[in-house]
């Protein structure tokens, strides 16, 4: 099972900020998430049913998930509808905002990602969005999901969510609706 500890959208909020269009609330949300430390990772690493942990940063969720796939020789199945989004970033994402790194990320590793036709373009871009101090992506056994989510929530990661699972197959990421 794949669990993401923070909401996505930091790069999108940064793009809105650079255009001078980000609200005070959006700025506050961006600062709050980028300054929230991922100390929870030390506790997660102690759990025997946690198999992998990585932080989602410049290559976005899809790129860092692909790293796990390559290391494990498995396929990751992500659900776009389950991806946590920073509330202030949602409208910007839907409006197509984002940094140029979104396109560069896709050019770098898109050949190893399958995106279902029912995934909205903004959802794909959100999964490619580079994060500054992004959330931890945790791969764990199904029986550990409740414990992993409880650890995240207890340490203030209110947007932590199950975003997908690993399966047998080639080292690829599949993003479906």
Language model: regions and residue ranges:
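Helix-biased detector of long, well-ordered alpha-helical tracts
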Residues: 1-177
């Amino acid at each position: 099972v794949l669990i993401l500890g923070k909401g996505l959208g930091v790069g999108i909020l940064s793009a809105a900020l650079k255009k001078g269009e980000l609200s005070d609330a959006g700025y506050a949300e961006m600062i709050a998430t980028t300054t929230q430390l991922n100390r929870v990772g030390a506790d997660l690493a102690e759990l025997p049913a946690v198999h992998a942990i990585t932080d989602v940063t410049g290559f976005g969720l899809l790129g860092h998930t692909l790293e796990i796939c390559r290391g494990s020789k498995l396929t990751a199945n992500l659900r776009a509808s389950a991806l946590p989004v920073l509330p202030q970033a949602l409208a910007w994402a839907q409006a197509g905002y984002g940094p140029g790194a979104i396109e560069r990320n896709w050019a770098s590793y898109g050949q190893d990602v399958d995106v279902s036709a029912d995934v909205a373009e903004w959802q794909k871009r959100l999964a490619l969005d580079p994060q500054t101090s992004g959330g931890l992506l945790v791969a764990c056994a199904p029986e550990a999901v409740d414990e992993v989510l409880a650890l995240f929530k207890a340490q203030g990661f209110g947007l932590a969510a199950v975003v997908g699972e690993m399966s047998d197959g080639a080292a690829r990421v599949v993003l479906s609706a």
